[in-house]
Amino acid sequence: MVMGRIHSIESMGLVDGPGIRTVVFFQGCGLRCSYCHNPDTWNMAGGKELTAEELLKKLLRFKPYFDRSGGGVTFSGGEVLLQPEFLIDILKLCKEQGIHTAIDTAGYGYGNYEEILKHTDLVLLDIKHVDDDGYKCITGKGKRGFDDFLKAVENIGVKVWIRHVIVPTLTDSKENIRKLANIIKNIRNVEKVELLPYHTLGINKYEKLNLDYKLRDIEAMDKEKRKKLEKYLKELLE
């Protein structure tokens, strides 16, 4: 029996997909994003072990809210693609119950991506950076792993919401936005694009975990500049 490691479960989520959602945070991540606000999800040995059936039982309590609001379950992390067998199991169980499924991912894991996506209604795709050097700078890994997942997304044709964090000096240039637009143009079924402002709310977690926060000297993203970049991106995508 495949066991999953779950960091936490958040009910009544309103921003991680359509409708009212329950967000299940998987434990473990292979990236070390400079601005990660959940470093407590990194360790694969953390969290609580559950079977897919045990997790489904918890999720079914919220099904009336899903049904009334057009919501469902979003599997986030950590990185959901690091537990591919468990993810497939729980996705299948949710679909059998008529629950809308979404995965919130950086596209960096392993396993049969296409099999995962066959049981996924929506992918919330976090594009960390637009080129290999930038990807390494932010995550510690190259962009190739992300590109492999993107191919699977294209092959299946699943619906996609794009997310990209705007970080001062790292991703806030017009050149970066132009490259981002070129990536998005080549993805089918993109329903929504969000430029998320970098914030510093997670710094206290690093202090508690005795971890170095690499972006300590970078201020939170200016809201007006983010809006201008969002407008620029929209113009490029029209």
UniProtKB/Swiss-Prot annotation:
Cofactor binding, per record: Binds 1 [4Fe-4S] cluster. The cluster is coordinated with 3 cysteines and an exchangeable S-adenosyl-L-methionine.
CDD domains linked to this entry: Radical_SAM (cd01335)
Any coiled-coil regions, as ranges: none
Cofactor or coenzyme needed: [4Fe-4S] cluster
Any one Gene Ontology molecular-function term assigned to this protein's record: [formate-C-acetyltransferase]-activating enzyme activity
Binding site for S-adenosyl-L-methionine: Y35, C36, H37, G78, D126, I127, K128, H199
Keyword Cytoplasm: yes
GO cellular component: cytoplasm
Keyword list, A-Z: 4Fe-4S, Cytoplasm, Iron, Iron-sulfur, Metal-binding, Oxidoreductase, S-adenosyl-L-methionine
Pfam families: Fer4_12, Radical_SAM
Gene3D superfamilies: Aldolase class I
Reaction equations catalysed: glycyl-[formate C-acetyltransferase] + reduced [flavodoxin] + S-adenosyl-L-methionine = glycin-2-yl radical-[formate C-acetyltransferase] + semiquinone [flavodoxin] + 5'-deoxyadenosine + L-methionine + H(+)
Annotated Radical SAM core domain residues: 15-236
Keyword 4Fe-4S: yes
Subcellular location: Cytoplasm
Positions with a binding annotation for [4Fe-4S] cluster: C29, C33, C36
Entry's EC annotation: 1.97.1.4
Cross-referenced NCBIfam families: PFLA
Function according to Swiss-Prot or TrEMBL: Activation of pyruvate formate-lyase under anaerobic conditions by generation of an organic free radical, using S-adenosylmethionine and reduced flavodoxin as cosubstrates to produce 5'-deoxy-adenosine.
Family that this chain belongs to: Belongs to the organic radical-activating enzymes family.
Name by which UniProt lists this protein: Pyruvate formate-lyase-activating enzyme
Organism: Clostridium pasteurianum
